[in-house]
C-alpha cells in the first residue's frame, strides 16, 4: 500500500518589535517548533553580546506570552494572494 506524501506545509510567523520570525513545517506544531528554534538561536546570539539582558529577553518557553504566533497554511502547487488561495 502506498501513502501519499504531504502536499502542504504551514508557516508560523511571529512579529517582534524589530524582526519577523518564521518557521516552516508539515503542520502547525512543527512550524511552531522551527520558529521557536529560530528565536532561541537569535536570543543566544544576543545574550552572547549582552549578557546583562538575560532577564529582559524571554526564552522560547515564555516568548508566546509576549508575542502572538500566526499560522499560514499552504498547499503545494497552489497560488495565493494575501494568504488566500486563488489557484
Question: Which sequence ranges carry the predicted segments?
Answer:
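Short, mixed-charge low-complexity intrinsically disordered segments
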Residues: 40-87
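Short aromatic-glycine-(Arg/Gly/Cys) micro-motifs in beta-strand/loop hairpins
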Residues: 2-20
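Structured catalytic/translocation cores of nucleotide/phosphate-coupled proteins
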Residues: 18, 36, 41-42
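A short, exposed loop/beta-hairpin motif centered on an aromatic-Gly-Thr core
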Residues: 17-30
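Generic detector of N-terminal low-structure segments
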Residues: 11, 21-23, 69, 76
Amino acid at each position: 500500500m502506498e501513502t501519499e506524501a504531504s502536499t502542504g506545509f504551514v508557516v508560523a510567523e511571529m512579529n517582534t518589535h524589530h524582526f519577523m520570525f518564521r518557521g516552516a513545517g508539515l503542520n502547525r506544531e512543527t512550524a511552531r517548533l522551527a520558529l521557536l528554534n529560530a528565536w532561541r538561536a537569535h536570543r543566544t546570539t544576543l545574550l552572547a553580546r549582552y549578557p546583562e539582558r538575560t532577564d529582559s529577553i524571554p526564552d522560547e518557553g515564555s516568548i508566546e506570552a509576549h508575542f502572538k504566533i500566526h499560522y499560514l497554511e499552504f498547499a503545494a502547487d497552489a497560488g495565493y494572494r494575501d494568504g488566500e488561495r486563488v489557484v
